Swiss-Prot record:
Gene Ontology BP term (one): glycolytic process
CDD domains (alphabetical): SIS_PGI_1, SIS_PGI_2
GO cellular component: cytosol
Active site per UniProt: E322, H351, K455
Reactions listed under catalytic activity: alpha-D-glucose 6-phosphate = beta-D-fructose 6-phosphate
Protein role: Catalyzes the reversible isomerization of glucose-6-phosphate to fructose-6-phosphate.
InterPro entries with a match to the protein in the record: G6P_Isomerase, Phosphoglucose_isomerase_CS, SIS_dom_sf, SIS_PGI_1, SIS_PGI_2
Protein name: Glucose-6-phosphate isomerase
Gene designation: pgi
Pathway(s) the chain acts in: Carbohydrate biosynthesis; gluconeogenesis; Carbohydrate degradation; glycolysis; D-glyceraldehyde 3-phosphate and glycerone phosphate from D-glucose: step 2/4
MF (Gene Ontology): carbohydrate derivative binding; glucose-6-phosphate isomerase activity; monosaccharide binding
Family matches, as NCBIfam families: PRK14096.1
One matching Pfam family: PGI
UniProt record similarity statement: Belongs to the GPI family.
């Protein structure tokens, strides 16, 4: 296609939202009217299924749940007065609590104001708040945010070292539907221990974000925590950023949550249009489906050309991969669906893996995220008539063209600037695109059985560890792996037993390892008395 034909093709496929000043360009994805025509029946079904989902249908059949994250930014859509009231009350509670913290009405018992947030959560309870904080938090926020989003002792040490004496002015958010998620529970227990060591009452600093009546809610209530905010069982973790999970930390940092919600609401309205060419989320789902032949054959590379959007690819990794990565479809057929997502930021990536994107395996499509406004301050000229922002834009356009010349597909999402409204719109755009794609390929995009399988396997390993330690505690002599395996009736688990013992020995957990580490089968282990 020559340059003039490509220009016309760009105009033919361009989507623009006037109120959000939001563009979606899929002209470099190889789409044709024939592709649209072929998938129109599937999209008609997907639009109808999405309409039913928003009306309160059981859209997550495996867990028997409604899927209601769209109601969070437009409570009038919720299917019952009770739900509408719960959503509005939760938002009002977030605003009131944040205002009281900012004013000092809610303050540390030692005096002064809260200055730090320690957010404890994992998965959607961390990735969304981290993305929004990186994108939108002011340079000098009313409270600085820190995250415990793993069960890594070295990570705990680093965060608590950063807090230092400011632990006494730290507000702790514990975010978990039940409170039983091991990583979140461990982070909470580590935090409690740090507060106790510092002579501080944890309850005077603690807030729970959880399901009403959950184990965590009961702990918070019985111990007199500062507040309890509701989560809803009809909102999944990866779509929870615009619930209390994300709104509370955002509001505490001084981010305008009304604009976040408004941006999402406006995008939701745009993505309800039952016409592929006039619906930006449908255009994304169409492009993904065409690129990967409906089987996820191409990876999704996310390249935001703005430092503040660095974490968008990590956020989308969970949203896309946890939603679409499924073994079976809704009819029980083995399909192994999914789209792999990775990315960093432009132009860093042009000095990293874009070399492979242009000249290596053509197993991907690129999504450029373009931000029109360079910054808030006037830019100097780094060359006559050229600013640093001109270079950023030029490198985006140059990479897009270089990929096109090698028949590497790409699409571009353009926003005017990074604001709460545009970030809310981005979140809503991809939530809807993922939902539509899930309907196109007939999978449940709202459960995560693979994650649950991993949790069960981890629990089994910890149970095995307890058995191993008990055997060694009771033995007067060193034991080899075979003897340990026989004693716990697990003769086929030599590798797991070895790996568990190696970890315990490395951490001075009472296990002594004897022998040559290069010969694991010859090692012996004993309990250090």
């Amino acid at each position: 296609m020559d340059a003039l034909a490509l220009w016309q093709h760009y105009q033919d496929w361009l989507y623009y939202h006037p109120e959000l000043e939001f563009y979606v360009d899929v002209s470099r994805m190889g789409l044709t009217p024939e592709v649209v025509h072929r998938l129109e029946p599937a999209f008609e079904r997907a639009f109808e299924q999405m309409k039913e989902l928003e009306a309160g249908a059981i859209a997550n059949p495996d867990e028997g749940r409604m899927v209601g994250h769209y109601w969070l930014r437009d409570p009038d859509l919720a299917p019952s007065p009770e739900l509408r009231s719960q959503i509005r009350d939760a938002i009002a509670q977030v605003k009131q609590f944040s205002q009281q913290v900012h004013s000092g009405a809610i303050a540390p018992p030692q005096g002064g104001h809260f200055t730090e947030i320690l957010s404890i959560g994992i998965g959607g309870s961390a990735l969304g708040p981290q993305f929004v904080a990186a994108a939108l938090a002011p340079v000098h926020p009313p409270l600085n945010i820190h995250f415990l989003d793993n069960t890594d002792p070295a990570g705990f040490e680093r965060v608590f070292a950063e807090l230092g004496d400011r632990l006494r002015t730290t507000l702790v958010l514990v975010i978990s539907k039940s409170g039983g998620t091991p990583e979140t529970r461990n982070g909470m227990l580590e935090a409690q221990a740090r507060f106790q060591r510092a002579g501080l009452a944890f309850a005077d600093h603690a807030v729970a974000v959880t399901l009403p009546g959950s184990g965590l809610a009961q702990v918070a209530e019985s111990n007199g925590w500062l507040a309890i905010f509701p989560m809803f069982d009809w909102v999944g973790g990866r779509t929870s950023e615009l619930s209390t999970v994300g709104l509370l930390p955002a509001a505490l940092q001084g981010i305008d949550i009304d604009d976040l919600l408004m941006g999402a609401k406006l995008m939701d309205q745009a993505t309800r249009v039952p016409n592929i060419r006039q619906n930006p989320a449908a255009l994304l789902a169409l492009a993904w489906h065409h690129a990967g032949k409906g089987r996820g054959e191409k990876d999704m590379v996310i390249l935001p050309y703005k430092d503040s959007l660095l974490l968008f690819s990590r956020y989308l990794q969970q949203l896309v991969m946890e939603s679409l990565g499924k073994e079976t479809d809704l009819n029980g057929n083995i399909v192994h669906q999914g789209i792999a997502v990775y990315g960093n930021k432009g132009t860093t990536d042009q000095h990293a893996y874009v070399q492979q994107l242009r000249d290596g395996l053509p197993n991907f499509f690129v999504t450029f995220i373009e931000v029109l406004r360079d910054g808030q301050e006037p830019s100097i000229e780094v060359e006559p008539g050229i600013t640093a922002g001109d270079y950023l834009s030029g490198l985006l356009l140059g990479t897009r063209q270089a990929l096109y010349e090698k028949n590497r597909p790409s699409l571009t999402v353009t926003i005017p600037e990074v604001t709460p409204k545009t970030v809310g719109a981005l979140i809503a755009l991809y939530e809807r695109a993922v939902g539509l794609y899930g309907f196109l390929v007939n999978i449940n995009a709202y459960h995560q059985p693979g994650v649950e399988a991993g949790k069960k396997a981890a629990a089994a390993n910890l149970a095995l560890q307890r058995q191993i330690v008990k055997v060694l505690e009771q033995s007067d002599e060193p034991l080899d792996l075979g003897a340990i395996a026989g004693a716990i009736n697990a003769p086929d688990q030599l590798e797991r037993i070895y790996l568990i013992l190696r970890h315990l020995a490395a951490n001075d957990r009472g296990i002594e390892q004897l022998g040559d580490p290069a010969q694991p089968s010859q090692l012996q282990f004993r309990w250090q008395r």
